[in-house]
């Protein structure tokens, strides 16, 4: 999961780096990306994409997958629809016994007691949580995340320019 559709160069660079890292670990890995622009995502990253708003396709892809990676970039938990959507994805993965990894995400300020509780519940059901800054770490601890949270650098800092340029 990530916000890969609006041609945001930072998010696209993060996605590129995550894809390259995964392919270094397993060159035969089959990666699918949730996107609103399937052709653009394929052209830029050479991976198949599924419409993030097509719940049926997402469920089918999650059922076929080993894991869901919630990818880098700032995650905005200000809108109820986003929180509910993420809760649905995490719950679906749990029901299907799929591993969930939040990788190098940034977590913005979460306000409101109910939003904090829902986000804490969601993050406490994620298998591995890796954030890209100490603010995000502190925010997750503040809202009640009991799971281990690791801090890493933003993946874009290790971005390597390749033949398919995003810049």
Question: Where do the model's predicted regions map?
Answer:
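Aromatic- and Gly/Pro-rich donor/ligand-binding loops
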Residues: 1-111, 121, 156-157, 162, ...
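A nucleotide-sugar donor-handling region in carbohydrate enzymes
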Residues: 113-167
